[in-house]
């Protein structure tokens, strides 16, 4: 009798496969609700295990401190602001209706006052391309144009940390430290390299699946490995 394979253990949601969110510093949401202007000064730039982009510690006018996403070109000592009537400059957060067409933006809200959901990874940016009534057209990093409510807020600028994917890890230890901060299962062992008790493709005198790799969508959890509900396998026919 076999036992649960790795995918089944991950699905259970135990601490081994759960993201270590107790190490994360902040959720990085926009400040306020957009009805009044708020400003603060950047006092430090830090690393957050939750993300690849750097974050900034900002001291607000009332003395409280918050973390924000850093955009390219801003540093310690600079002032950032939130509000509908603040200046359109790098690092400031405004409603989309207040940002001119052609501006680079990031950390865009999906709905007004949800804190920011889109375009938050290192080195990415979106562009305001169109305004029709209370809808704002934004060209996303994928190239697709997405329409937002005009009251949704966004930060002006490009997310800092661009070029990260061009730098190699060099050592397995570096990759290990990175993956340790996520819920990823790394390193990933091939099913054919496992014992027969650990995976449907395991065991045998040599490494081979030993059975068809295509599997139906509704198959029991321990058997849904390989090409699940595949439309086709092998080379595509033109």
UniProtKB/Swiss-Prot annotation:
Keyword Metal-binding listed: no
SMART domains recorded: Ribosomal_L2 (SM01383), Ribosomal_L2_C (SM01382)
GO molecular function (one): rRNA binding
Pfam families in the cross-refs: Ribosomal_L2, Ribosomal_L2_C
Keyword Ribosomal protein listed: yes
GO cellular component: cytosolic large ribosomal subunit
Keywords for this protein: Ribonucleoprotein, Ribosomal protein, RNA-binding, rRNA-binding
GO biological-process terms attached to the record: cytoplasmic translation
NCBIfam families, sorted: PRK09612.1
Protein name as annotated: Large ribosomal subunit protein uL2
């Amino acid at each position: 009798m076999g036992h649960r394979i790795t995918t089944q253990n991950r699905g259970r949601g135990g601490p081994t496969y759960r993201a270590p969110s107790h190490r994360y510093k902040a959720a990085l949401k926009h400040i306020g609700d957009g009805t009044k202007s708020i400003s603060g000064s950047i006092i430090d730039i830090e690393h957050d295990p939750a993300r690849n982009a750097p974050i900034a510690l900002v001291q607000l006018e009332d003395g409280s401190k918050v973390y924000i996403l850093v955009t390219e070109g801003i540093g310690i000592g600079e002032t950032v602001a939130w509000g509908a009537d603040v200046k359109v400059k790098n690092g400031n957060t405004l409603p989309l209706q207040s940002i001119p067409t052609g501006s680079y933006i990031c950390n865009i809200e999906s709905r007004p006052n949800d804190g920011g959901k889109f375009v938050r990874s290192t080195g990415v940016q979106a562009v305001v391309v169109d305004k029709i009534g209370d809808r704002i057209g934004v060209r996303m990093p994928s190239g697709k144009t997405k329409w937002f409510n005009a009251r949704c807020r966004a930060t002006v600028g490009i997310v800092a940390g661009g070029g990260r994917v061009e730098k190699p890890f060099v050592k397995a230890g570096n990759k290990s430290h990175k993956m340790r901060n996520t819920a990823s299962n790394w390193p990933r062992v091939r099913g054919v390299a496992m014992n027969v008790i650990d995976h449907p493709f395991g065991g045998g005198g040599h490494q081979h699946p030993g059975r068809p790799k295509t599997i139906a969508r509704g198959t029991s959890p321990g058997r849904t490995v390989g090409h699940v509900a595949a439309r086709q396998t092998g080379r595509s026919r033109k």
